[in-house]
């Protein structure tokens, strides 16, 4: 139950440093070069532009089910190279015990690029 352990206490100022935004998935490709089965995903964040990410979510989501889905992502982490692919944002989700991820999304249509707070 390692996932259930609470992490160290963070301050409100720590939280304010993280820029979490609403985006819409506009492209999903198989990421064959990745070590674990993954997708390459392009996300439209409105005025922030289109950003790329990778996600190990193929067991719970088919590519066609992800297109046009709104998601929530951290947009101000430094880019990370994954098997030669530049991942620019971190898509947020709920971590299940088996390691699968359930994507977080607004419960209503939200303007692209709007902040989560």
Where are these regions (language model features)?
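Phosphate-backbone binding interfaces of nucleic-acid-interacting proteins
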Residues: 2-117
